[in-house]
Amino acid sequence: MKFTKMHGCGNDYVYVNLFEEKLDDPARVSIYVSDRHFGIGSDGLITIGPSDKADFRMRIYNADGSEAEMCGNGIRCVAKYVYDHKLTDKTEISVETGAGIKYLTLYVEENKVSQVRVDMGEPILTPGDIPVVKADGSAYSDDYRVIDEPISAGNREWHMTCVSMGNPHAVVFVDDVAGFELEKYGPLFENHKMFPKRTNTEFVEILSRNEAKMRVWERGSAETWACGTGTCATVMACILNKKTDNKVLVHLRGGDLTIEYIPETNHVFMTGPATEVFSGEIDII
């Protein structure tokens, strides 16, 4: 199997071009290639193929083989791949994802894509669509918004704000994100009974009205160096809690992303880098 390893702010995936390769069991392949000791080493597998709705279609598989709806860092790398590998010559493209069609603007330097701006669409705040339920398992009303909501995890009470960007996110504000015990608390949120489909969790430190720092525990992949949808959800949570303005520079372990919310259209835009690391071939056992 031919592959290309790419990353967006350190959120790394193995990319397979389905115009050239055939994958019978991508979930199993994702588990195999993601292993950082016995495989290629990545946060998962992303396939790039044809779409009858958009210019391209991407599918995302986590390191545990589960399929994700959307990946913000991954979709920027898809844009770089299709342009740099001459599958398109357009700098405005559309990509079909599990969370709908996304529209991307490619910024090109010396015939290579360096940055990508993604229209991440509208944030989803309806609890049943995220999904998130009450601690007793009952449903929130559709017009309720889970903002600064108490949640018990690890014998502590926290406050979270829940947003979906096509996949579920719980955002928690902390004082010191660098020293936060992510490995301890991340799994407790991911598998909490309030999240019927599990959740991604962002732990966020506010630096100013236009700047924040975050770490992310991803559903199915543990801590990753960056999460594009999570960064968008984080900025929406900051705005909903009146902690920042509508345009925020977010520092992640693997780099920086700029997120802008446009109230007039209710759309979130993400701008950030995409990097190709290397290409190769691997025998899937």
Curated annotation (Swiss-Prot):
Q: Which organism is it from?
A: Agathobacter rectalis (strain ATCC 33656 / DSM 3377 / JCM 17463 / KCTC 5835 / VPI 0990)
Q: Where is the active site?
A: 71 (proton donor), 227 (proton acceptor)
* Record-given protein name: Diaminopimelate epimerase
**Disulfide-bond pairs as recorded:** none
Which reaction(s) does the protein catalyse, per the Swiss-Prot or TrEMBL entry? (2S,6S)-2,6-diaminopimelate = meso-2,6-diaminopimelate
Biological role stated in the UniProt entry: Catalyzes the stereoinversion of LL-2,6-diaminopimelate (L,L-DAP) to meso-diaminopimelate (meso-DAP), a precursor of L-lysine and an essential component of the bacterial peptidoglycan.
Q: Which NCBIfam families match?
A: DapF
Q: Which domain of life is it from?
A: Bacteria
What keyword terms does UniProt attach to this protein? Amino-acid biosynthesis, Cytoplasm, Isomerase, Lysine biosynthesis
**Localization:** Cytoplasm
Site entry: Could be important to modulate the pK values of the two catalytic cysteine residues: 169, 218
Per the record, the major location class is: cytoplasm
Q: What is its EC number?
A: 5.1.1.7
**Amino-acid biosynthesis recorded as keyword:** yes
One Gene Ontology MF term: diaminopimelate epimerase activity
Q: Which SUPFAM superfamilies match?
A: Diaminopimelate epimerase-like
Tell me the gene name. dapF
Q: Name one GO biological process term.
A: lysine biosynthetic process via diaminopimelate
Annotated pathway = Amino-acid biosynthesis; L-lysine biosynthesis via DAP pathway; DL-2,6-diaminopimelate from LL-2,6-diaminopimelate: step 1/1
Q: What does the record list as coiled-coil region(s)? A: none
On subunit structure and binding partners, the annotation says: Homodimer.
Q: Which GO terms describe its cellular component?
A: cytosol
Sites binding substrate sit at: 11, 62, 72-73, 167, 200, 218-219, 228-229
Q: Which family does it belong to?
A: Belongs to the diaminopimelate epimerase family.
Q: Does the keyword Cytoplasm apply?
A: yes
